[in-house]
């Protein structure tokens, strides 16, 4: 008989505690017979029948809960995996959603996830700290969620307009379902614990009812006991369940399931509790409605922090009635400085105290010496405001710093009797005795050098494409003005070493700037300019070239440190190259011998050297010296790390090779954006120079199997272009150069010219040069000349003779130029021909082998090498080296082998005998 038709009593299902576990005591008669009476299906555990809606929604809520946990720990990879599973689960529940509508918790997770991803995307610092997998998952998930949310746009919009209402509706629904349950906490997915437990407790099992019977009072009504008996007889018995499951069920039932009110007092208390909850709910709704009405009627509201703002009183520096003297002020200054650098010190308050101390000293006429000393400490405190080296100064602090340095310089220029220096000890300071020169410990040069470093950090940490960068760049005029003032001060009172240091600062702010006014004066002859223009030019001061010459020569003569002299030489060369003074720049580079030992310099100097070499190569290209330009740019471009070597950014592949600290150090060495060299212009100059050198060389050595490559990068671009199955019109700069190279191979200079010089290339490259028209004219002439050389190399075997006038017309070159080019080729033995002066023709000598002969020669050479390799392998297998014994045995190629192996064979024969 099935267990569903058996009746059991309370004694049959009583449980007893064994150790710490709650175990059901089985009946003796049924225990042994149960495996024989029950079928396989009846031995299965009890199943809870749920609807399809509950199953699908539970699957969705579990996935949502996992996503929210991943969001809390910023695990974007886990979010991506669970979001894909969530989409699949939602697809399975589509039929239910079409009937019931989209669940509110699903809309909430979509909106929250999209906002969360947008916050992560905008957090630049956080993105940098992400690992590779999370960063990739963030980009992928952001695209997927934006695409996925388009189908739920209306639901998400309504949710975002009133998210609180959606949450309240869910809360009300859960409160009604729970009917006064003590646990009102709603989880993140809108399903409360009370609702969950109520569903479970609507049809309790027999064991749980029995357990609750024992916990209830014994004075229950007879109807309740009869109902319990009916439940006992009518419910399914759990005798076949494991002891562990029974223990868990009884424990959960006793902990979570509610008890029915047994007395009138309990019923009244429950009723009162429900009334209180309904009243609280009504109060919340009315309060929210009142607030909304006030918001609509009262206009705009202003958000304040912590109520009425209090007027901040100035801190009291001295007690009332204290006499302000030099000693008192210096003592107070030392007290303030003692807290400097300590943990918990308010740096902003410390700066305010020092500024207040300056005002007190000025009001009491304590002298300029005390004010200068306090000013030095204010500037030092401004620099120490950010303890982290990588953090740049805030705009307000930066403005205070510039103003304070200017005020300090005003005082020093107005009072020549004040001497400042690092070598002055605090014991020997003279701050108030006017009979002697005032002496203050401090170094104005160190403050200015730190100011320059802070300016560089500000420019490094500002978005170069924003208006903020332009505003910060305007501050460079103030920085340069301060450097000039300090330069004038140190020229009068500073040492030679200090003058060299301030000169270098001035050079570093001058060398990269193109002097347009001096350039215009060079283009305009002095006779054509009026007298007023000449007077204006004289009043403007010296040109940047004259200034650089004066400052650098002083450093060359007076400096005792290699670093300052090296930086000055490199800046001087850069400035010469920038203004197209090629020969001065080249001679200075060769005489300095910097290329021999630059690898021992520190990284910032190496970056400056790389920038100088690049500018030198661009200068040579503007002058039409393509070979010099190619040689100067070869090291930078062949490495494939031009961006990193020039200090203009870090490569992604190199970021994996260094840790976070090394990356921070590398970023601090980067050059600000306004000092950058255009990398596309640099690559274009290099590739065009390589094209003008490589294409004629390839045509001249076409049959040479061992020809060397002048530029590996140029050959790589040619191979990439040849691999493309379909060739459309060129778009990028590299494609333009490759297409021009193919045209030059055929001697078609016009097509080559159209690919190199056009509107697209003008906008990207050629218009960026100061003298763009001059550069374009030079390029056209170079293309014509090298195309002529390529044509003669390629088709010399076709002609017996060719007229120079014909060549002049083909390449649109004047006759003397054609004559000069051909003469150089004949003299250098590049072209086997002779010039017939009366007829102005080039007579070919035909000493070069034809194409068929070249192929035959190559085949013969390869066959010869193959025979030698086979003989060597055979000798190695036979154990004889040099083939002597084999040749003696059967005379196989005896003479030829002897002649070919020569001395080695003879030496072996001597040792054998």
UniProtKB/Swiss-Prot annotation:
Region annotated Disordered, chain positions: 1-44, 157-301, 522-542, 885-913
Compositional bias (Acidic residues): 166-190, 217-232
Pfam families per record: eIF-3c_N, PCI
Keyword Ribosomal protein part of the UniProt annotation: no
UniProt xrefs under PROSITE patterns: PCI
GO molecular function ontology, one term from the record: translation initiation factor activity
Compositionally biased tracts (Low complexity): 8-21
Phosphothreonine modified-residue sites: 524
Similarity-based family: Belongs to the eIF-3 subunit C family.
Function text: Component of the eukaryotic translation initiation factor 3 (eIF-3) complex, which is required for several steps in the initiation of protein synthesis. The eIF-3 complex associates with the 40S ribosome and facilitates the recruitment of eIF-1, eIF-1A, eIF-2:GTP:methionyl-tRNAi and eIF-5 to form the 43S pre-initiation complex (43S PIC). The eIF-3 complex stimulates mRNA recruitment to the 43S PIC and scanning of the mRNA for AUG recognition.
Protein name (Swiss-Prot/TrEMBL): Eukaryotic translation initiation factor 3 subunit C
């Amino acid at each position: 008989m099935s267990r569903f038709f058996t009746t059991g009593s309370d004694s049959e299902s009583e449980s007893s505690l064994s150790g710490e576990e709650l175990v059901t005591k089985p009946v003796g008669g049924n225990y042994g017979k149960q495996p024989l009476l029950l079928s396989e299906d009846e031995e299965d555990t009890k199943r809870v029948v749920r609807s399809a809606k509950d199953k699908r929604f539970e699957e969705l809520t579990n996935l949502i809960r996992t996503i929210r946990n991943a969001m809390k720990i910023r695990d974007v990879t886990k979010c991506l995996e669970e979001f894909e599973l969530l989409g699949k689960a939602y697809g399975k529940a589509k039929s239910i959603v079409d009937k019931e509508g989209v669940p509110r918790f699903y809309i909430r997770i979509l909106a929250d996830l999209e906002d969360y991803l947008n916050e992560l995307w905008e957090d630049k610092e956080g993105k940098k700290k992400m690992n590779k997998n999370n960063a990739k998952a963030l980009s992928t998930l952001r695209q997927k969620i934006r695409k996925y949310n388009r189908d739920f746009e209306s639901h998400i919009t309504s949710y975002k307009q009133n998210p609180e209402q959606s949450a309240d509706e869910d809360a009300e629904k859960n409160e009604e379902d729970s009917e006064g349950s003590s646990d009102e906490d709603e989880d993140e997915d809108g399903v409360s614990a009370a609702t969950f437990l109520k569903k479970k407790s609507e049809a309790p099992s027999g064991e749980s009812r029995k357990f609750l019977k024992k916990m209830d009072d014994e004075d229950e009504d007879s109807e309740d006991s009869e109902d319990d008996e009916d439940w006992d007889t009518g419910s399914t018995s759990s005798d076949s369940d494991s002891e562990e499951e029974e223990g868990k069920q009884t424990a959960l039932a006793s902990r979570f399931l509610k008890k029915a009110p047994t007395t009138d007092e309990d019923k009244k208390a429950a009723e009162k509790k429900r009334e209180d909850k309904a009243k609280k709910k009504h109060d919340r709704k009315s309060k929210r409605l009142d607030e909304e009405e006030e918001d609509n009627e009262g206009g705009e509201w202003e958000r304040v922090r912590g109520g009425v703002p209090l007027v901040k009183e100035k801190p009291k520096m001295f007690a009332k009635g204290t006499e302000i003297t030099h000693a008192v002020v210096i003592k107070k200054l030392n007290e303030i400085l003692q807290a400097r650098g300590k943990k918990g010190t308010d740096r902003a308050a410390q700066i305010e105290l020092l500024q207040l101390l300056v005002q007190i000293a000025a009001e009491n006429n304590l002298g300029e010496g005390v004010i200068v000393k306090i000013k030095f400490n204010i500037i030092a405190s401004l620099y120490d405001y950010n303890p982290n080296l990588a953090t740049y100064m805030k705009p307000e602090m930066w403005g205070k710093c510039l103003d304070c340095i200017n005020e300090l310089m005003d005082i020093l220029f107005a009072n020549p009797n004040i001497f400042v220096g690092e070598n002055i000890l605090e014991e020997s300071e003279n701050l108030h005795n006017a009979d002697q020169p005032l002496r203050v410990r401090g170094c104005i040069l160190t403050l200015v050098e730190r100011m320059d470093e802070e300016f560089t950090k500000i420019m490094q940490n500002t978005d170069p494409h924003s208006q903020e960068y332009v505003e910060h760049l305007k501050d460079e005029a103030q920085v340069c003005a301060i450097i000039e003032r300090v330069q004038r001060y140190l020229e009068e009172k500073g040492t030679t070493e200090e003058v060299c240091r301030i000169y270098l600062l001035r050079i570093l702010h001058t060398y990269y700037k193109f002097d347009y006014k001096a350039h215009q004066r060079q283009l305009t002859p002095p006779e054509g300019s009026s007298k007023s223009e000449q007077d204006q030019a004289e009043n403007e001061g010296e040109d940047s070239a004259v200034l650089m010459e004066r400052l650098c020569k002083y450093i060359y003569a007076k400096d005792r440190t290699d670093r300052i002299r090296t930086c000055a030489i490199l800046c001087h060369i850069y400035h010469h190259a920038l203004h197209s003074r090629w020969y001065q720049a080249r001679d200075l580079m060769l005489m300095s011998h910097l290329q021999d030992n630059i690898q021992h310099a520190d990284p910032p100097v190496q970056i400056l050297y790389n920038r100088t070499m690049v500018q030198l190569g661009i200068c040579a290209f503007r002058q039409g010296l393509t070979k010099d330009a190619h040689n100067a740019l070869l090291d930078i471009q062949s490495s494939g790390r031009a961006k990193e070597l020039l200090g203009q950014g870090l490569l992604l592949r190199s970021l994996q090779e260094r840790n976070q600290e090394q990356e921070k150090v590398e970023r601090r060495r980067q050059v600000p954006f306004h000092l950058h060299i255009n990398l596309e212009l640099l690559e274009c100059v290099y590739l065009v120079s390589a094209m003008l050198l490589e294409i004629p060389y390839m045509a001249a050595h076409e049959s040479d199997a061992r020809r060397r490559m002048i530029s590996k990068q140029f050959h790589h671009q040619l191979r990439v272009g040849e691999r493309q199955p379909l060739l459309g019109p060129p778009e990028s700069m590299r494609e333009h150069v490759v297409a021009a190279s193919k045209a030059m191979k055929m001697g078609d200079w016009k097509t080559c010219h159209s690919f190199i010089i056009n509107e697209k290339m003008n906008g990207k490259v050629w218009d960026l040069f100061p003298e763009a028209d001059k550069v374009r004219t030079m390029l056209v002439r170079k293309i014509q000349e090298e195309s002529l050389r390529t044509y003669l190399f390629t088709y010399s075997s076709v002609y017996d003779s060719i007229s120079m006038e014909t060549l002049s017309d083909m390449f649109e070159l004047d006759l003397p130029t054609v004559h000069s080019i051909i003469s150089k080729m004949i003299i250098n033995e590049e072209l086997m021909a002779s010039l017939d002066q009366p007829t102005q023709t080039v007579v070919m000598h035909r000493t070069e082998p034809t194409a068929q002969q070249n192929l035959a020669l190559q085949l013969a050479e390869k066959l010869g090498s193959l025979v030698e390799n086979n003989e060597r392998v055979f000798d190695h297998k036979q154990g004889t080296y040099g083939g002597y014994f084999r040749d003696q045995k059967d005379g196989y190629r005896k003479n030829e082998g002897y002649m070919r192996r020569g001395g080695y064979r003879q030496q072996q024969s001597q040792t054998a005998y």
